[in-house]
Amino acid sequence: MRRTTPFRRKLRPMRVIDLRSDTVTKPTPAMRKAMAEAEVGDDVYSEDPTVNRLEALAAEILGLEAGLFVPSGVMSNQIALMLHLRRGYEVIAPEGAHIYEYEPGSLAVLSGGTIRLVRAPYGIPDPAEVKAAIHTSIHQAPTGLIELENTHNAAGGTVVPLEAQRAVQQVAREASLPIHLDGARLFNAAVALGSSAAELARGFDTVSICLSKGLGAPVGSVLLMPKALRAEAWRYRKLLGGGMRQAGVLAAAGILALTEGPKLLARDHQMARTLAEGLARLGLEVDLKTVQTNMVYFRPKDASGLAARLAQVGVLCNALGGRIRLVTHRDLSDEDIPEALRRIESVLVET
C-alpha cells in the first residue's frame, strides 16, 4: 500500500534584520514617484531644475549661501578639503574621524595633505588641545583647516553639543583657519539636541550632509558653502567625475529626504536605545552613554566571529576594529528590534 505524504506546513523565509548601516534604506513609494516624475536637464550645464531646487533647499535649511549636489559623502568631504587646503598642509580632526578612518587616503591623493588627530572623548575634542595642535613652524606641516564630525560615527554616533562646536570654532577664528563640518548625520544630531540643523551648521565655512543615510534617499550628499566657493567646488566635482547629467531623478528623492526624513529620526534613536539596553541585559559590553542617536557599539570577545554567526540567523551587522556596530533606520519594523535581541541571545547561548 502506498504511503501518503504527511502534511507539511510551508515555512516562511526568515526575515533578514539589516543593522549594518542606515545606508541600506530603500527609497519610499513617494520618493520613487517623485523620481519617476522629476523634471530633468543636464546638471553639468547647471540646467537640471530639480537639482537646482535641491541645492537651494539644502542651503536654505542649513543657513549657508550655496549647495552642490554630489554622489557621495566622501566626495563632499574631499571637495571641501580641496577648497581649503594647499598641498603639504594639515587638517586637525578628532580621533576616529571619518576623513581619517574611512576615506581611503583621499586627502593625501587629492589634496596632498595630512591629518593630525586630537583626542576626542565621545567625539568631542578639547579646544585647548586643538589650539595646541596648530602648527606654524617651518619644520612641521602647517595647519590649513580644522574639522569636526557631528554626529561622530566611530565614537558611537555621539553628538557634539553646540557649545563644544562654538569653542572649537573660536579656536579656528583666532588662528584665522577655516573650519569644516562633516555633518553626514547632522540631522540626527539636531534631533538628539532638540536643535535645528541650521543652528548646528552656523559658524562653519563648509558643511557636508548626507541624504542617503537616515534621511532615506538612494544616493547623494550636498556640500554647503559660501557662494564665493561654489564655482571652484563645481570644478572639483567635475575633476573627480561627479557630474551626473540628468541627476534630477536622484535629486527628487533628495528633496523628500530633506523635507520628510528628519521627522522619522527620533524613532530610529528610540530603537537604538531599546536595542542597547537589551544588549546590556544580555551581559554584553555596551557603553550606554554613547547611545545618543541611531548607533549601538559593543565589544564581544570575537567581533568578526559573532557577526558571521549572527548573519546565519538573519541579523546583519558590521565588525569594526574589535567592536560590533548596529545601526537603526527607517526600514526597520517595530518588531525587528525585539526579534533581533531574541536571535542575538540564541547565538550567545550556543557559544
Cite the ranges covered by each PLM segment:
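Conserved PLP-enzyme active-site core in the AAT-like
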Residues: 11-300, 304-313, 317-332, 340-350
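N-terminal amphipathic/basic-hydrophobic helices that include classical n-h-c signal peptides
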Residues: 1-13
